[in-house]
Curated annotation (Swiss-Prot):
It comes from the Bacteria. One of its GO terms (cellular component) is mismatch repair complex. Belongs to the DNA mismatch repair MutL/HexB family. One of its GO terms (biological process) is mismatch repair. Keywords: DNA damage, DNA repair. InterPro entries: DNA_mismatch_repair_CS (IPR014762), DNA_mismatch_repair_MutL (IPR020667), DNA_mismatch_S5_2-like (IPR013507), HATPase_C_sf (IPR036890), MutL/Mlh/PMS (IPR002099), MutL/Mlh/Pms-like (IPR038973), MutL_C (IPR014790), MutL_C_dimsub (IPR042120). GO terms for molecular function: ATP binding; ATP hydrolysis activity; ATP-dependent DNA damage sensor activity; mismatched DNA binding. This is DNA mismatch repair protein MutL. The gene is mutL. This protein is involved in the repair of mismatches in DNA. It is required for dam-dependent methyl-directed DNA mismatch repair. May act as a 'molecular matchmaker', a protein that promotes the formation of a stable complex between two or more DNA-binding proteins in an ATP-dependent manner without itself being part of a final effector complex. CDD domains: HATPase_MutL-MLH-PMS-like, MutL_Trans. The keyword Acetylation does not apply. It holds the Pfam family MutL_C.
Amino acid sequence: MRKINLLDLETTNKIAAGEVIERPFSVVKELVENSIDAGAKNITIEIEDGGQKLIKIIDDGEGIYPIDIKNAFLPHATSKINSIEDIYKISTMGFRGEALASISSVSKTKLKSRVDSYNFGKEIYIEGGKIEYLKDTGCNVGTTIEVSDLFYNVPARLKFLKSARSDSSSISDIVNRFILAHPDISFNLINKGKQSIKSYGTGNLKDSIRCVYNKTISENLINFESHKDIISVYGFIGKTEISRKSRTNQSIFVNKRYVKSKFITAAVENAFKSFLTVNSYPFFVIFIDIFPEYIDVNVHPTKSEVKFKDERAMFKTIFDAVHEAIKGELKESFTNFFNKEDINIYDSEKSITEPIKLEKEEVQIPIDLNSNNKIDIFGNNINKLPNNTELLKNIGVKAKNTLENNNDFYTSKQNEIYYANKNDECLNSCNKDNYSKIEKSLQKDNKNPDTLYLNEHNTNSSSINIKENKPNNFYVDMKIIGQFNNTYILIEKDKELYIIDQHAAHEKVLFEKFKSEIEKGYVISQILLSPVVIELSEDEFNIYEENKDIFKNSGFSVETFGEYTINIKEVPLILGKPNVENLFMDILYNLKNMKSKETSTIKYNAIATLACKSAVKANDNLKEEEIKKLIEDMLILNNPYTCPHGRPTMIKFTLKDLEKKFKRIQ
């Protein structure tokens, strides 16, 4: 082994500079952050050759006291903290005291600064970490710093620099992030003597977004905010029209600091999941204000990453805020169409074991449900009534399928649903008045029988609730024009034209049904003919061990088969015929990286695919009653506006929109 040597100060400074100063944009970032901490309201950045030849920062901040000018360039010299405890209370951009020392050790640096209480300022010039001179000078209040010939004394770093154009682009990007983070500060970027970027410091975030991007983006934004005890989440998300194929238009700011965070990005993108198409990424500018003691900003040399005390709670707060904002925007767009006061909506979330106030046309019939007579999760296999339950059949108890039943109705197949019961005594004990009420209700209008909705929330319950879904005013001012190309449904309502994609709409109805089954725990498993054996890494196996219940509740039957090997015997029937190993590993990956514990989330894509395959297709001819049924089912949904893959289920044209198209109005 070689002898251990103590490195001299110059060498250690150059090594430290390599961590803090990667490229010219790193210099701009550190110096502009110093200007912001100094309270500057106007900051000018001048660069030449992508910052490799010259970087000049001029601000009107508080300035540096003459006595501190020399100390400012010493390693770990800072005015921001006094002890290690202060790091966890930090509210400024910088705090380590490394930037100026690192920059001056690998460049030629000149700094001039003056505070308001002095009539003159100080100027210092440092070359390669050595002070060449320190003198009095005349200058404005604030600080001007010039960094030239970056890495001139570190040839190994110099040859790895990118092109001037690439570095200029990186500097422009970081300046744009500053403009977004600080709308109250005016930034001016000058490249080769020409103005490249200019913001006006109006304090309005929308003005900053328009400055950084363009008018189109600034006019397609959705505001959102959520405030908790220790955290506030707010900002703007873009409408689906301005989504992109990359994440370049995404900005995250934690306490005004621009950071990169995979889990925050995942929270926002998951909120957009059912609103965007595959491989599309949302636009967003998100601000997170949190007490400093709940984050650690000292986990990365450039402070571009932060660590949160409770990432799970943070994920939920961000997801909920963004998701509600998107839903609210879409809901507002289709307020006239989805006016749920116009129709009696069946409450599929209410448990049948709860007392329910029966309205005029409602009947409850107690039925003993034997475990052998379960309704299939897709509503396909239903046993016929034996013996005296034939009474229900004879009076014509029929039900068109709903969210809780198979939607074969849309393919012109109307199923008769008979209530299976092997315990005849239960039915015999029913009040005869109930049957007369049912018969009256069903025979009220033989030409247009009312639709009955059936719900079996729990196969162990002793009763089934039958509720009539009777339209009130919904169809009064709605006119079904028909189908276009047997694919799009045309509807006129309140002087607005709605075009519904029948496949996307039905796909969403089915998806919500499948999703509901999983959330309520009614998952039926299918036994595999050949169990699937999967070898896991130690880390993957530990994640599985921590989340056994998740897999069990999702319909998996898994056994340990060796040290880090598992044996899968059963998988959820609802997912059809998946690639078992890929599905299992996808869930495991989500549990590790997305912090998701909801089975509905970790199986989202598989459910969406199944719904897509089961839904009515383009070119399927639908009758008017089938169209009405589809619309009624859409009304029940919390989010009927997009299919699970993010495509819109419907679009709207107002009378004004059409008259503009035909040049009737301007």
